[in-house]
Structures are given as structure tokens and as C-alpha cells.
């Protein structure tokens, strides 16, 4: 039974989607005014893992992640650099999409705000017509928070003194009302509307795009904890006010923040790490493994030490799979299982049960990865020592199953056992030559071959009279 933590109820709840067999997910994407950084990746990878696990569980999942391509930050950056705002958007959208591809984050729909202006205007007009919003003298439109009695429950801010919105304007009825539509200012991009030229406020866009692609009620709304207030609180208010659906979102899920040396990663502290810079030092799949194997709600520490550990873990995983592929060339189907083989097989099944039990517990990827490493240990300690057809193929299938969630290994694991690539044949030949050198007691040259292969990322494993190789470089 899958249970998830709901920010709204502040408790674990049994996961039951709105529509049986189908899961709808909306994740707040980036405002594209700067390079994507590792803090963004924390959220995107976490929800990619969640989505992949739900698919593994048999759900039909639709994952929407928006792109905010009009915002104060974009306008300010364009003004500071003397560029057209659309150039800023194009540059950083490209960077964002390239980062997702390298991290193997799979998104079904990437809606952009500027492609949904007519829908946003329609949404705002309906809020005005229903008495939940008002037009100010400037032509800006604000949501009247007092018309939504449940405001503050998502964030736990039940005192009105805690509601003050970032943008205070004397034309608002209350300081905590928030902008749905911003009246045009000189030199800024704008669109025509019934209230005059202007552009959308920040919060309205996600309500509009999520409802367009997922419906008036959907399952999971995700983002970082920094978005709970005011962004998600405001989204919830305007959507439930208009649709009358409660809850509008069934499960609110939020990722923990990243820290650097105990401090929050933020632009104000100048400790942001752009992904494009990080990828120069680490394989993007090392970064993915680090992020994918942490519980999504934990506060995550960023350091070279944790990335080096992830690199080592990825090397060990890749090595285990490569070892299994090599072993698959040696083994043949057998008859009756030995007691020893049955015991190892049961340990593999235990690892599988632990993987699912962890993921069913609020997507505890940390616990699930411990099960993956348990299987990895079995491959090195048991299967490689006494390989059999059943154990080798079962282990490969389990890695393929786990990788459907982790997404860090080759996609062709299950079929890879039968493949023999030219590099495999070359390494097999080198190992064979080294074995003959050892038979001739030419240990100096045999050790030289081992040392050179190791420097190239190939580890040799001497087990009795048999030597096998694995790739270790990540």
C-alpha cells in the first residue's frame, strides 16, 4: 500500500488517485532568466523518480512541468543586459531543456505561459465575475483573499498578519491580496485584455496550465518547500474559489531544500551551483544518482564528498551489471536448483521486496537504494563466485526493474546480456593473454596489464583460475 505525505494535512495518507489507474502530476518549473542550477534539479529529479515509480506500479501517469517565460525577473535581466526579453527566454529555456535531457528527467508536457495568455485572461475574468477578484484603477487585477475563507491552511499561516504579499500597492483592498494581472508599464511586454494592456501575475499561470492539461481536479502538485507560500497558497485559493472543487489538488508534495555547508543554497548568498558548471566536473548521471537516491523531503547537503560517493556508487552499479553481462556469456540453463542457489535467489527477492516497501513508504528512495546496493553486493560476493543461469539472469532483470525508477544505467539491461560489443571482445582477448602470461609465471607483465587497465577504468577480478573484468569509470 503506497502512502504519501500531504503538505496540506501534514500527515501520511494512503495514495488513491482521483481516477483509478491514472495519476496526474503538475510540477512548478523554472522562470527562465538564468542558468538552471542544482537546486532546480533537486525538485525535477525527485518528481521524475516519483513519476517513474508510479509507472512501474502500473499507473498511467501524465507529468506536466511548466516554463515561466514572462516575469519581472526576465524583464529586469533583459533591461540590465540591453537585450530583448525573448532572447533571454530562448537562451535559458535551451539551457533548462538540455539539463533535463542530461539528467534523464522525462516530462510529458512543457507548457509556456506566453502560449496560454487567452486562457489566463478567461480565468481572471471568471474570478472577477464570481466576485473573487477586482479591477484596480491602474488596470491591474487582484484576487480578494477575504472571499476565500480557507486561505493560509496549506502554509499553516492562519494569522492575517502573516499574509502580506511581496507586492504591496495602495490600490489593493488589503495588503495580502495578490496580483492576477499586472497593468502595463512603459518598456515592458504586454498583451491586451478587457482591463487594459498588461501581463499575467505569477500565480495565475500554474492554475490555468494545470487545469488545461490535467483537469479541474488532479492528484499531485509538486515543487520546493520555498513555493508553499505564497505561490502554492495563492494557486490553491484562486483555483478552489473558481472551480468549487475541494480539494483542488489531492496531494501537495514538496521537496526539501539544498544546503551548502549548512546554509540554504540561494542567489542572495551567492552559493548557487549552475548545472552547466557542475556537469564539467561530474557525469550528469552521477548528479542524478545523488539526487534520485535521497528522500525527496529531506534537506540535502551539497558537497564534493557526497558527489564522489555517488560517483563511487554509480561505478559499482555499472560494474555489477557489466559483470553480469560477462557472466551471461559463460552460463547455460540448468536443471534442479541447489540449496545454495535457492538461498541466493531468496536474498535477491528480499532486496526486491525491500525496494518496493521503501518506495511505498512516501517514495523513500534512500531506503530503496539500500536494497539496490544489497543486490549489487550479492552480485560481487555470491553470483560472481559461483555463477548460474538463473542467478545471472534474475539479477539482470532486477537491475532493469530498479533502473526503471533510478534511470542511471543503460536502457538495454535486460537484452544486454546477449550482446557482445567489439570492446567486450577486445577486453576478453586481453584477459586471455594475461591469463597465459600468469601460466608462464610472467607476473611482472601480467601485473602491468592489470595496472594499465585499471587506469583506463577496467577492473580485473581474479577468482581462482578465472579472471573477469568490469568497467568502473563513471
From Swiss-Prot:
| Pfam family name, one | DALR_2
* Chain location of the short sequence motif 'HIGH' region per the record: 30-40
Record keywords, A-Z: Aminoacyl-tRNA synthetase, ATP-binding, Cytoplasm, Ligase, Metal-binding, Nucleotide-binding, Protein biosynthesis, Zinc
Q: Which family does it belong to?
A: Belongs to the class-I aminoacyl-tRNA synthetase family.
Q: NCBIfam families given for it?
A: cysS
Q: Where does the record place it?
A: Cytoplasm
Task: Please identify the protein, giving its name as recorded.
Answer: Cysteine--tRNA ligase
What HAMAP family does the database record attribute to this sequence? Cys_tRNA_synth
Positions with a binding annotation for ATP: 267
Question: Biological process GO terms, please?
Answer: cysteinyl-tRNA aminoacylation
Identify the residues that bind Zn(2+). Answer: 28, 206, 231, 235
One GO cellular component assignment for this chain's record is:
cytoplasm
* E.C. designation(s): 6.1.1.16
User: In chain numbering, where does the motif 'KMSKS' region fall?
Assistant: 264-268
A single GO molecular-function term is:
cysteine-tRNA ligase activity
The UniProt entry lists the main location of this chain as: cytoplasm
Q: Which cofactor does it need?
A: Zn(2+)
Known catalysed reaction(s)?
Answer: tRNA(Cys) + L-cysteine + ATP = L-cysteinyl-tRNA(Cys) + AMP + diphosphate
What the record notes about the co-factor is: Binds 1 zinc ion per subunit.
Amino acid at each position: 500500500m503506497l502512502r504519501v505525505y500531504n503538505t496540506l494535512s501534514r500527515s501520511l495518507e494512503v495514495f488513491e488517485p482521483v481516477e483509478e489507474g491514472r495519476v496526474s502530476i503538475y510540477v512548478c518549473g523554472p522562470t527562465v532568466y538564468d542558468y538552471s542550477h542544482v537546486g532546480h534539479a533537486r525538485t525535477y529529479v525527485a518528481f521524475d523518480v516519483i513519476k517513474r515509480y508510479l509507472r512501474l506500479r502500473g499507473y498511467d501517469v501524465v507529468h506536466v512541468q511548466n516554463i515561466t517565460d514572462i516575469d519581472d525577473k526576465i524583464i529586469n535581466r533583459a533591461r540590465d543586459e540591453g537585450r530583448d526579453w525573448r532572447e533571454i527566454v530562448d537562451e535559458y529555456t535551451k539551457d533548462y531543456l538540455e539539463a533535463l535531457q542530461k539528467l534523464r528527467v522525462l516530462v510529458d508536457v512543457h507548457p509556456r505561459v506566453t502560449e496560454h495568455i487567452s486562457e489566463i485572461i478567461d480565468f481572471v475574468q471568471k474570478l472577477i465575475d464570481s466576485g473573487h477578484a477586482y479591477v484596480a484603477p491602474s488596470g491591474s487585477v487582484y484576487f480578494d483573499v477575504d472571499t476565500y475563507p480557507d486561505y493560509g491552511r496549506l502554509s499553516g499561516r492562519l494569522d492575517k498578519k502573516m499574509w502580506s504579499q511581496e507586492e504591496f500597492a495602495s490600490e489593493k483592498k488589503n495588503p495580502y491580496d495578490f496580483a492576477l494581472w499586472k497593468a502595463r508599464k512603459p518598456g515592458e511586454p504586454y498583451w491586451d485584455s478587457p482591463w487594459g494592456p498588461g501581463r499575467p501575475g505569477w500565480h495565475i499561470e500554474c492554475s490555468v496550465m494545470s487545469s488545461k492539461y490535467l483537469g479541474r481536479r488532479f492528484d499531485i502538485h509538486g515543487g520546493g518547500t520555498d513555493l508553499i507560500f505564497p505561490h502554492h497558497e495563492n494557486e490553491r485559493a484562486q483555483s478552489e474559489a473558481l472551480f468549487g472543487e475541494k480539494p483542488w489538488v489531492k496531494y501537495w508534495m514538496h521537496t526539501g531544500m539544498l544546503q551548502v555547508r549548512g546554509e540554504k543554497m540561494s542567489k542572495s548568498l551567492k552559493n548557487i551551483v549552475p548545472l552547466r558548471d557542475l556537469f564539467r566536473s561530474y557525469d550528469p548521471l552521477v548528479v542524478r544518482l545523488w539526487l534520485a537516491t535521497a528522500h525527496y523531503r529531506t534537506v540535502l547537503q551539497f558537497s564534493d564528498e557526497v558527489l564522489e560517493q555517488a560517483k563511487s556508487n554509480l561505478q559499482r552499479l555499472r560494474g555489477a551489471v557489466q559483470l553480469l553481462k560477462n557472466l551471461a556469456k559463460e552460463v547455460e540453463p540448468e536443471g534442479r536448483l541447489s540449496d545454495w542457489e535457492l538461498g541466493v535467489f531468496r536474498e535477491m527477492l528480499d532486496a526486491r521486496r525491500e525496494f518496493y516497501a521503501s518506495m511505498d513508504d512516501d517514495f523513500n528512495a534512500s531506503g530503496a537504494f539500500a536494497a539496490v546496493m544489497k543486490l549489487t553486493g550479492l552480485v560481487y560476493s555470491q553470483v560472481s563466485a559461483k555463477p548460474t543461469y538463473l542467478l545471472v539472469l534474475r539479477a539482470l532483470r532486477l537491475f532493469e526493474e530498479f533502473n526503471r525508477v533510478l534511470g542511471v544505467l543503460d536502457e538495454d539491461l535486460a537484452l544486454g546480456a546477449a550482446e557482445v560489443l567489439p570492446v567486450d571482445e577486445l577486453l576478453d582477448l586481453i584477459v586471455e593473454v594475461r591469463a597465459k602470461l600468469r601460466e608462464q609465471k610472467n607476473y611482472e607483465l601480467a601485473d602491468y596489464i592489470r595496472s594499465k587497465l585499471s587506469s583506463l577504468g577496467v577492473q580485473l577480478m581474479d577468482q581462482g583460475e578465472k579472471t573477469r573484468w568490469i568497467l568502473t569509470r563513471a
